[in-house]
Curated annotation (Swiss-Prot):
Residues at which ATP binds: 335
Catalytic activity: tRNA(Met) + L-methionine + ATP = L-methionyl-tRNA(Met) + AMP + diphosphate
Biological role: Is required not only for elongation of protein synthesis but also for the initiation of all mRNA translation through initiator tRNA(fMet) aminoacylation.
Lineage, uppermost ranks: Bacteria, Pseudomonadati, Pseudomonadota, Gammaproteobacteria, Enterobacterales
Pfam families assigned: Anticodon_3, tRNA-synt_1g, tRNA_bind
Organism encoding this protein: Serratia proteamaculans (strain 568)
Span of domain tRNA-binding: 573-675
Protein name, as recorded: Methionine--tRNA ligase
Amino acid sequence: MPQVAKKLLVTCALPYANGSIHLGHMLEHIQADIWVRYQRMRGNEVHFICADDAHGTPIMLKAQQLGIKPEEMIAEMSQEHQQDFAGFGISYDNYHSTHSDENRELSNLIYGRLKENGFIKNRTISQLYDPEKGMFLPDRFVKGTCPKCKSPDQYGDNCEVCGATYSPTELIDPKSVVSGATPVLRDSEHFFFDLPSFSEMLQAWTRSGALQEQVANKMQEWFESGLQQWDISRDAPYFGFEIPDAPGKYFYVWLDAPIGYMGSFKNLCDKRGDLDFDEFWRKDSTTELYHFIGKDIVYFHSLFWPAMLEGSNFRKPTNLFVHGYVTVNGAKMSKSRGTFIKAGTYLQHLDADCLRYYYAAKLSSRIDDIDLNLEDFVQRVNADIVNKVVNLASRNAGFISKRFGGQLADKLADPALYQTFVDAAQSIAEAYASRESGRAIREIMALADLANRYVDEQAPWVVAKQEGRDADLQAICSMGINLFRVLMTYLKPVMPSLTERTEAFLNCELSWDSIQQPLLGHQVNPFKALFNRIDLDKVNEMVSASKEDMVAAKVVTGPLAEDPIQDTITFDDFAKVDMRIALITSADFVDGSDKLLKLQLDLGGETRQIFSGIRSAYPDPKALEGRLTIMVANLAPRKMRFGISEGMVMAAGPGGKEIFLLSPDSGAQPGMQVK
């Protein structure tokens, strides 16, 4: 009995519209796309949507810095994001924005229902206010020490170390991220969502199978510590949706951001005309809703979001699929090391399918972090895809094309081996369905090894030289091509670009069910290179370009722009320089020079004579007498036509009249070493 097709709505977390997509973001979108492509291959109806998260103070402030309107900035960012996702083959049916008419309408609707049902409370709160910038500070614009685990440098809404949530006023030693000032408390009326009212429902939903075990266990900790009412409002100035009947008050970005899933789908429904929004979002919906998210936003998606939906009479998610972070070469992504790699930078240097394959090979249904080791990345893709999979086609296709006009044999050379490949479909399907793509890849590569062993044993290059064995040669190579077809069918969710080229070569569409029947007597097209080996030099170029991205992103002005920092030295190099405090006992012009002053320096028991090019900045040298300065005491003496200079005084500035002799703080004495 054929399986009844399911109707699925799938989302990824909404990228924030104030910055570029990087390879850390891409993990989630690739994982979701692999799952979506698999579901489509199995005949399920899938609607895959996303949007830019386009509201909040960070966007407002960045737009101000750029001198443009927030609307203009988010439009440019959306175009860049969509271009990056398309470049990686992410098969979204719709990509929208939270700053949309659909999202405003739905946000107002959900808020109105929550208010009508008694789940919105208002009260006056004391809120952190930046006295220098004249604005209330959003949670993410205050940093301090976590009140729970005491980790420093944590945001004002939740701790990235222990996962705790709290009010910004609970932070220890808070500072404004905007100005660095210490915030002050000011009163303001705010609106709160009554999250504790949903505690019982949320605990039942948590254990319903909607969450991974690791997430469910973490939520239990939050339940035990007690749920708090959630502040859903922000004060002007703010870029977002103004709360109905509350002038100067705006929805907090985390209220309208998840509603953006609904807004994007509503936009798709309106564009298509054959989709029913209510069928997917009404409370008794029989469709399935899946959110792929990172572990850093579990709290919002596992508590606030289902509670908001429940309180406004909409359906809850079927599952949250949570993943870990991406590290590069075993460490946090770093701009200075060039491992903070933008998606666009990657696409300028490498094939998107390479990263898709590498992530797929490492992903599981757990929340483990994924390490993108760049050397292993090169080796694995080349070994698996180039040497095993694509090579299987290339070493057989030449004979089929040249000797048999592209015609495959009418019979299978080894039906039992082919059946082994087909029988693996169920296990690989189960792996894909459960987001165990790493297990699927391992099984596929084990089959690739079998296929290559078959070709090695049959040695078509030897058979080709033997008279009267044309039928054997055609059968062997046709078998190799058929095994390649099965492998590529299994890899289709992972590598869409390679799949497209493969389908062009094989002259047929790759589908899950069609592998039951091998290609017999089938005409294939002339073989062209399907996949290029990764060159480590290309990876290094990408890393170098990522460093350049960082430099370009930071517009350096002032002294650093005119006189950049020189190459790094070791501490041992620095330790060779002996700097001492010196007292200027006399300072005079040098006859015959319009640049130099002659200084006599007392080192506390030793006197030095120094010629220094600071005359233009100190037209009255006598003003320097009696002043403490810093000199390099172990610089080799330099013979000049005016005498011998026995060191160098320290000064800053570009030159000319802008030279500033360095002086130590009060209390320093001649002869003291500067360390």
